[in-house]
Amino acid sequence: MRSLHILLVFTASLLASLTESAKADSLARTVSVVDNVKVKSRFLRAQTDEKNEERATITLGDRVVSDKAATKDLLQQLLALGTPLEKVQKQFLNIPQMKTFAELSKHPNWKALDKYERMQWQKLKEGETLTFMRLGDRLYSKEKAQEQLLRWVAQKKPVESVYDDLQVAGFAHNTVAARQNWRAYIMYDKWFTAASQMQRNPQQYAKFGTGYHSEQKTTELFEKWAMEGTHIKSVITTLKLNGKSASEMANNENFPALLKYVKLYLDFKPVRDLNAKSRLQARRPIS
């Protein structure tokens, strides 16, 4: 808590300094935001656990302060103030001008800069459905991308195969597909890892509706829903997984149940198609 307090105070002082350029310049000289030479010094860490995937690490003298919530708050407030990307890059992230994207993407603070750039774009395109993932010529919103990724997890599609399909190998070359698909790939990697490690009590398998349900009862309900064609999106809401981040979903007690439903939904598709065909034929007039 003390670390969080220190970081929040530091954040407030940084934001206040934006309104007075002289103070901002002075602050930039006296307070170092992460030395990019030290491995431990990162604004957004590349290696963290599932619950702390995104945290600020800012050096205050000999101290290192780190907190996920303050990172998000700092970037959001910088965005609200309309802080230019170049100023965030130089003053707050200490990232010098790079000649190539490959050099930039190797900088320890690159992920923070990339996140801020995405936030700016989303603000500019507020109200529009933004592309979260691209497969060939097909574009996916975040919601549709999540559904497709869940299908792959349920089918146990290898991470390496998804890596190839999303063309994220081109990330170092700044290809359009790689930049659009990087977040989708990270999301899939988290979900696939969680799926391979998850364990559930068969007597308290899923929590929804009236409370906990056994695996047997859950399966019976899910089979009925899958037969009826209840959409995956609806079940995500029923399991109270809507609106959660990829990490929050992966760590939620209902995530195994969601994957079970996705698999059943896919398995029952031939049955649904057959029933739909039968209903269509039954409605045709007899000649």
From Swiss-Prot:
Primary localisation category: secreted
Inducing factors: Expression is induced during host plant infection.
Keywords (A to Z) from UniProt: Host cytoplasm, Host cytoskeleton, Host nucleus, Repeat, Secreted, Signal, Virulence
Q: Where is this region: W3 motif?
A: 221-244
GO cellular component: a single term: extracellular region
Transmembrane residue ranges: none
Q: Where in the cell is it found?
A: Secreted; Host cytoplasm; Host nucleus; Host nucleus, Host nucleolus
Signal peptide start-end:
1-24
Q: Where is this region: Y motif?
A: 246-267
**Where are the annotated segments for W1 motif?**
115-138
Please tell me which stretches of this chain the record labels as motif RxLR-dEER: 42-55
Q: Where is this region: W2 motif?
A: 148-171
- Record-stated family: Belongs to the RxLR effector family.
| Domain remark text | Oomycete Avh family proteins have a modular structure with an N-terminal signal peptide (SP), an RXLR-dEER domain and a C-terminus with a variable number of modules that consist of W, Y and L motifs after highly conserved residues. The C-ter of Avr4 contains 3 W motifs, 1 Y motif but no L motif. The RXLR-dEER motif functions as a host targeting signal (HTS). The region containing the W2 motif, in combination with either the W1 or W3 motif, triggers a necrotic response in potato plants carrying the resistance gene R4.
| The protein, known as | RxLR effector protein Avr4
Q: Which gene encodes it?
A: Avr4
